[in-house]
């Protein structure tokens, strides 16, 4: 009797392991199928545009508000960030969460940032058109800020 019980138990166990258990999980709709390496290799060529082409495309349009990022877009600020990173956390990016870093960057080390010529040209084109230019930054706000506004204004030739 014992052998029969063990045999039936073994058969029942084997049969129960045969089926896959499926949890009922909500699956969202597929939004994007993604791309393959082949598709990436066949991308369309990039069309670079000049400030003159942008200006021409805006002819006849009413003045508009435009916004531009500051750091490493219009403003080559990597040297200042690099200098302060070495001081606060040379081996990681924890310096970005350190208020002392931002005080130093926004008040001292931004003087090592440089405007990019294309940024100067683009801002001047928009100002000439009568557009309102806004600058956007992801920088952490500090108690004081003596460099950023001053150097962006001076570097991009923005009238006071």
Curated annotation (Swiss-Prot):
N-terminal signal peptide: 1-23
InterPro entries given in the database record: Acid_phosphat_B-like, HAD-like_sf, HAD-SF_ppase_IIIB_AphA, HAD_sf
Domain of life where this protein originates: Bacteria
Cofactor(s), names only, from the UniProt record: Mg(2+)
Enzyme Commission code(s) on record: 3.1.3.2
Cofactor binding notes: Binds 1 Mg(2+) ion per subunit.
Active site: 69, 71
Pfam families, alphabetized: Acid_phosphat_B (PF03767)
Keyword annotations: Hydrolase, Magnesium, Metal-binding, Periplasm, Signal
Residues reported to bind Mg(2+): 69, 71
Binding site for substrate: 137-138
Annotated compartments: Periplasm
Reactions it catalyzes: a phosphate monoester + H2O = an alcohol + phosphate
Similarity comment: family membership: Belongs to the class B bacterial acid phosphatase family.
Record function comment: Dephosphorylates several organic phosphate monoesters. Also has a phosphotransferase activity catalyzing the transfer of low-energy phosphate groups from organic phosphate monoesters to free hydroxyl groups of various organic compounds.
Subunit structure as annotated in this protein's UniProt entry: Homotetramer.
Protein name: Class B acid phosphatase
């Amino acid at each position: 009797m014992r052998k029969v019980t063990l045999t039936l138990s073994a058969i029942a166990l084997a049969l129960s392991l045969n089926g896959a258990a499926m949890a009922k999980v909500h699956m969202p709709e597929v939004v994007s199928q993604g791309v393959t390496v082949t598709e990436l290799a066949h991308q369309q060529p990039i069309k670079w545009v000049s400030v003159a082409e942008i200006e021409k495309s805006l002819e006849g349009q009413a003045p508009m508000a435009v916004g531009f990022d500051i750091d490493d877009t219009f403003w080559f600020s990597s040297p200042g960030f690099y200098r302060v990173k070495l001081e606060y956390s040379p081996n990681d990016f924890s310096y970005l969460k350190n208020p002392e870093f931002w005080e130093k960057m926004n008040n001292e080390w931004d003087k090592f940032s440089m405007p990019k010529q294309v940024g100067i040209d683009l801002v001047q084109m928009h100002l000439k058109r009568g557009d309102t230019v806004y600058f956007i930054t992801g920088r952490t706000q500090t108690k004081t800020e003596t460099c950023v506004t001053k150097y962006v204004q001076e570097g991009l030739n923005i009238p006071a």
